[in-house]
Amino acid sequence: MSKGIVLLAAGGTGGHVFPAEALAFKLKERGYSVHLVTDSRAERFAGKFPAEEIHVVPSATIGSKNPVAVARSLWTLWSGMRAAKKLIQRLKPVIVVGFGGYPTVPPLLAATRLGIASMLHEQNAVMGRANKALAPRVKAIAGGFLQESGDVFSDKTVATGNPVRPAILAAAEQPYHPSHPGEPFNLVVFGGSQGAQYFSKAMPTAISLLDDELRARLRVTQQVRPEDMEMVRGCVAQLQMGADIAPFFNDMAERLAKAHLVICRSGASTVSEISVIGRPAVLVPYPHALDHDQAANAAALAATGGAKVIVQSELSPERIASILSHVMNDPEKLSHMAAAAKLAGKPDAANLLADMVEAIAAGKTVSEFKRTRA
């Protein structure tokens, strides 16, 4: 018999959906039924989500200064709140947990108005806009990189870390095996669940600048946006090198486990996953993030020695080629980085977050939960 329904709400990108998925698996193991509220974008990422049902509720972000656009967004949000209220009244969840992104706003607002226990999980070192708007209303906040002190919401914040999916935990069991000169070198390049156009343009040029011996060693996995596929495949064909190019990889965990180096953006889920697996990385924060959250996430891992952070404006193809030339001939350096990344990982974050969800659902305060952890 189910202990009750937990309703999870997450924006439709991998950065929001993947940690929600990790929590869902833990809650299912503990006897709960899980439902997910998200948007249509999540279809690519929610294939393995262990939800009884996935619900799409109208939502919108208010990012425009156009009065007509703002009015439409407010109408959509109001419609979403009505739909979320009906959904919550039907499901009667024991708690509603939001993972950020604008699709979380209607169900969390509805839950707080209906008196249902509610909490947030913030993946980043800087709280996103949706979570920031909801934070005063919810009972508790779990943080991936948030601190438990020095913030207006610190009295109800617990630093749980970011939960990672079972596939990542399985990959973490594989030790790092360095690539020595003359041996194949697995390079994984990606820009988060939605890809990164910058890497599509920079990486082929960088690889073309390597000497023949190094290029022959490379085995590249690169995530590429659909609109860039033809261009990147053409470049790879000209270079006559081994490469897997795709808009999305369902087996990314296994590819990360085999990687000798990762070059990627620094979204919270990405940083958490590569640290749990323990792989050396060059992190390139997304330069147009409103709150510079990726820069803060990257700095957290770089401080441990597990990653090197380079801002995009300073990362030319020539510099990428130079980095590859050095590290491909320095397996000891990469091994040290891999070990440092592994030490920074929080593989038990999903268990801790599930403990917190159960505590808040049972009516405990954050202070009471913290005392049980002490």
Swiss-Prot record:
It catalyses: di-trans,octa-cis-undecaprenyl diphospho-N-acetyl-alpha-D-muramoyl-L-alanyl-D-glutamyl-meso-2,6-diaminopimeloyl-D-alanyl-D-alanine + UDP-N-acetyl-alpha-D-glucosamine = di-trans,octa-cis-undecaprenyl diphospho-[N-acetyl-alpha-D-glucosaminyl-(1->4)]-N-acetyl-alpha-D-muramoyl-L-alanyl-D-glutamyl-meso-2,6-diaminopimeloyl-D-alanyl-D-alanine + UDP + H(+). InterPro entries: GlcNAc_MurG, Glyco_trans_28_C, GlycoTrans_28_N. GO terms for biological process: carbohydrate metabolic process; cell division; cell wall organization; lipid glycosylation; peptidoglycan biosynthetic process; regulation of cell shape. UDP-N-acetyl-alpha-D-glucosamine binds at T13, G14, G15, N124, R165, S193, Q294. The keyword Cell wall biogenesis/degradation applies. Coiled coil: none annotated. SUPFAM superfamilies: UDP-Glycosyltransferase/glycogen phosphorylase (SSF53756). Keywords: Cell cycle, Cell division, Cell inner membrane, Cell membrane, Cell shape, Cell wall biogenesis/degradation, Glycosyltransferase, Membrane, Peptidoglycan synthesis, Transferase. It is found in: Cell inner membrane. Its EC number is 2.4.1.227. Disulfide bonds: none annotated. Signal peptide: none annotated. Belongs to the glycosyltransferase 28 family. MurG subfamily. This is UDP-N-acetylglucosamine--N-acetylmuramyl-(pentapeptide) pyrophosphoryl-undecaprenol N-acetylglucosamine transferase. It comes from Rhizobium etli (strain CIAT 652). The lineage of its organism: Bacteria, Pseudomonadati, Pseudomonadota, Alphaproteobacteria, Hyphomicrobiales. The gene is murG.
